[in-house]
Each structure stands twice: as structure tokens, then as C-alpha cells.
Design a protein with these regions (language model features):
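Long C-terminal subdomains/extensions of small-metabolite kinases
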Residues: 1-159
Length: 159
């Protein structure tokens, strides 16, 4: 979700590697979509043990208006690891097992987790492999099949 129109100075540790910068938005995703159908991480797979992380540096409202539809549709990603050229000057992408964020400007960010919002000064997200069994519909297998990892058992039955 949008952190603020001006951004926040954050220290972000991604699998232990630290980055410091001003960001207006951060999306930490285990699945491809969040609130209202935004496809922040179009290649995310819930079964790969990794989080897909999108960080956005502050841009103008005019720029936001120009790119929002593409971002919502997941067209900011060229492939599973690459941001499209149009977004590269202000957007970065990472894939990791854990991410920690700490606010450095003394103004809390609003974290939204599963639709619940809370002001926080720091947060940590980490994948705990096989900690939870989740029943997914057939399309959930598609990302792993596209990446060639395995054949989805549900798709095999349909053929």
C-alpha cells in the first residue's frame, strides 16, 4: 500500500543486506495480488519459500496517474526478475526469504496486512516453509508451471 505521498526514509534489510532510502510504497508479497486486485508481484508463487518485494521511490502524482493501471495489471514486471524499463528509475524488485523495515524519519508507516491497517515504526516478514497448509484453486498452480518447476496435479487431471 502507499506509504505516503511524500515517502518515508526507511532502512530495509532483505535477507540481511541493508538498503537505506526514501520510499513512497513497499509491497511485500507471498502471492501475486493485494487489495483491490493490484498485481504487485505477478510472478510470485506461494509455494516457492520466497517473498517478492517491490519498493517504490517517491514520484509525482502525475507520474502515479500515468503508471497506476500498468502497475495494477502487473505490467511493471518484464519477467520474474526484471522491472520494465519505464519503471526502473523509481522501482526496485527483490526476491528473498525475509525482509525487515525500520522507519528512520520518526513518522510511522501504515502497514496493511490482509486488509488490516496499523501504524508501525518497524516490521519483519519472513517465510516459514511448510508452516501452513493452504488449499489453492487451479490457477494458483500456474506460476510454478510457467516457471517449469513442476506439472500442476490439478491441470494433469483436466487434460
Amino acid at each position: 500500500a502507499m506509504l505516503s505521498r511524500f515517502g518515508h526514509k526507511l532502512r530495509v534489510a532483505i535477507d540481511g543486506k541493508e538498503y537505506t532510502g526514501t520510499y513512497m510504497m513497499a509491497a511485500i508479497c507471498n502471492g501475486g495480488y493485494y487489495g483491490g486486485g493490484y498485481q504487485a508481484a505477478p510472478y510470485a508463487a506461494m509455494d516457492d519459500g520466497l517473498l517478492d518485494i517491490v519498493l517504490v521511490k517517491p514520484i509525482s502524482r502525475i507520474q502515479v496517474a500515468g503508471i497506476l493501471a500498468k502497475y495494477k495489471a502487473g505490467r511493471h514486471m518484464q519477467d520474474a526478475d526484471t522491472i520494465v524499463p519505464e519503471f526502473r528509475s523509481f522501482m526496485t524488485f527483490y526476491r528473498a526469504r525475509s525482509v525487515e523495515m525500520q522507519v528512520l524519519d520518526n513518522r510511522p508507516i501504515i502497514a496493511t496486512i490482509d486488509g488490516e491497517c496499523a501504524p508501525v515504526m518497524e516490521l519483519k516478514a519472513e517465510v516459514l516453509p511448510s508452516a501452513l497448509n493452504v488449499l489453492l484453486p487451479q490457477p494458483a498452480c500456474s506460476s510454478a508451471v510457467i516457471r517449469g518447476q513442476y506439472e500442476c496435479p490439478l491441470q494433469a487431471k483436466v487434460r
